[in-house]
Design a protein with these regions (language model features):
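N-terminal, positively charged regions that mediate nucleic acid binding
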Residues: 2, 12, 51, 63, ...
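Walker A/P-loop phosphate-binding motif and the immediately C-terminal alpha-helix
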Residues: 36-74
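Phosphate/Mg2+-binding loops and adjacent switch elements
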Residues: 121-146
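Extreme N-terminal, non-catalytic leader segments
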Residues: 1-44, 66
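Phosphate-binding loop that captures ATP/GTP phosphates
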Residues: 66-67, 72-118, 122-123, 129
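Alpha-helical scaffold segments in soluble metabolic enzymes
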Residues: 55, 59, 78-81, 130-135
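Solvent-exposed alpha-helices and their adjacent loops that cap or buttress functional pockets
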Residues: 30-33, 89, 97-102, 139-142
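Conserved, well-folded catalytic cores of nucleic-acid-processing
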Residues: 15, 63, 82-86, 134-142
Length: 146
């Protein structure tokens, strides 16, 4: 640490050992209990990300693990339909509660928040990113292993 250090690393250009990098990772809702996260991603649409996610969650659930699926496909959500879920997610002052499938898989998708599940969502860029982040920060995932 420099002799002139005032302890304010955000305005300092020195690379001292006291500097701790700021995490850019959004923290989940404090009431959530989440084990590990498996991301199923691709830059291309229509390659089976939702199908793989649904099958992976089902396989986890069948082996005794508790699973949840965060459907980040805001403009074309299909996870609720894959699981046959049509009821809306619920919310209170503490957060949003995901819908639960017949087999106990917790799911969160934008169409679980719409009045009509097939209403189009015409969002772009930062608004989509904000919605996905809210699914992580505002949803209360109840003791999921994956």
């Amino acid at each position: 640490m420099s002799e002139t250090c005032g302890g304010n690393c955000s305005s300092c250009s020195e690379a001292c050992s006291e500097r701790k990098p700021e995490s850019l990772q959004a923290q989940p809702n404090p009431k959530s209990k989440i084990g590990k996260v498996i991301a199923v991603v691709s830059g291309k649409g229509g390659v089976g990300k939702s199908t793989v996610s649904a099958m992976l969650a089902t396989a986890m659930q069948r082996t005794g693990r508790r699973a949840g699926v965060l459907d980040a496909d805001i403009t074309g959500p299909s996870i609720p339909k894959a699981f046959g879920v049509s009821e809306c997610a619920s919310a209170d002052e503490e957060g949003i509660y995901p819908a639960v499938t017949e087999s106990g898989i917790q799911i969160m998708s934008v169409n679980l928040l719409l009045e009509h599940e097939d209403d189009p969502v015409l969002w772009r860029g930062p608004i989509i990113a904000g919605a996905v982040e809210q699914f992580w920060t505002d949803v209360i995932w109840d003791n999921v292993d994956y």
